[in-house]
Design a protein with these regions (language model features):
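Bacterial N-terminal signal peptides that target proteins for export
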Residues: 1-12
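N-terminal signal peptide c-region/cleavage motif recognized by signal peptidases
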Residues: 18-21
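Residue-level hotspots at or immediately adjacent to binding/recognition sites across diverse folds
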Residues: 27, 49, 93, 148, ...
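Sequence/structural segment immediately N-terminal to covalent heme-attachment motifs in c-type
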Residues: 28-53, 122-150, 165, 222
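Gly/Gly-Pro-rich "capping" loops immediately C-terminal to redox-active cysteine motifs
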Residues: 33, 51-80, 91-96, 143, ...
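Inter-heme linker and motif-flanking segments adjacent to c-type heme-binding CXXCH motifs
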Residues: 50-57, 83-86, 111-131, 135, ...
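Extracytoplasmic c-type cytochrome modules immediately beyond a signal peptide or single-pass transmembrane anchor
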Residues: 59, 70-118, 123-125
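C-terminal capping alpha-helices of c-type cytochrome domains
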Residues: 95-120, 194-222
Length: 222
């Protein structure tokens, strides 16, 4: 059964990767972090405040995006824009951005990781999960996409999740299980297949562990 799920997951990963790959012959938009700094006014009101909480679809801290991979940020914004991720506020913001805007904003937030790397001490090894969480990680094949320490995704369009706010991770994981709702839910075949294997209590245990790992993600006050 695990081998079958791994095969299905691999096929789904390939299809999602193809979805976000530039069309053949199309030129990928290159982001400019300097230009991006001038375009983040709509971002900093939530993502630039330490401890800021959202209340939709439930109370949770807004995700850390400083240090996140640029290609993932662009992919996420496009998902909000097309309503593959349902979130009225984020959809309105994403719809206001051109491809160049998205690339610039993403480049700006990714650059924070490089800036921090020069000044920050070496990251500590990830703490070992307890037996229950280790079993859940293996069952979900989490590292096969998110990489060692949950900070080295195998594809740049996938997120770094180590050190992300645990309550946000929990809310996001549950959203992949949500179907047929107008304003809540995320359409992603890979993550839906993973999340639906677990109870909400198990998803919370995963989120709490992953959120406890030191990673590149930060909240940088603006």
């Amino acid at each position: 059964m695990n081998k079958l799920f791994s095969t299905i997951s691999a096929l789904a990963v390939a299809s999602v990767t193809a979805l976000y790959a530039p069309a053949s012959g199309a030129q990928e938009v290159k982001g400019d972090p300097v230009a991006g700094q001038k375009k983040i006014a709509m971002c900093i009101g939530c993502h630039g405040i330490v401890g800021y909480q959202a209340s939709f679809p439930e109370i949770h801290k807004v995700p850390k995006i400083s240090g996140q991979g640029a290609k993932y940020i662009v992919a996420a914004l496009n998902e909000y824009k097309t309503a593959a991720r349902k979130h009225p506020t984020m959809r309105a913001i994403a719809e206001s951005l051109s491809e160049q805007d998205m690339a610039d904003v993403a480049a700006y937030y990714e650059a924070h990781a490089r800036e921090q790397a020069g000044a920050a001490p070496a990251s500590k090894p990830a703490p070992a999960p307890n037996a229950r969480v280790a079993e859940l990680i293996t069952k979900g094949n989490c590292i096969s996409c998110h990489g060692d320490g949950f900070s080295k995704p195998i594809d740049p369009a996938y997120p770094k999740i180590a050190g992300q706010h645990a309550d946000y991770l929990y809310s996001a994981l549950k959203s992949y299980k949500t179907e047929n709702q107008q304003y809540v839910g995320r359409s992603n075949g890979v993550m839906a297949g993973v999340a639906k294997q677990f109870s909400n209590a198990e998803l919370k245990a995963l989120a709490n562990y992953i959120g406890s790992i030191e990673g590149d993600l930060k909240v940088v006050p603006e």
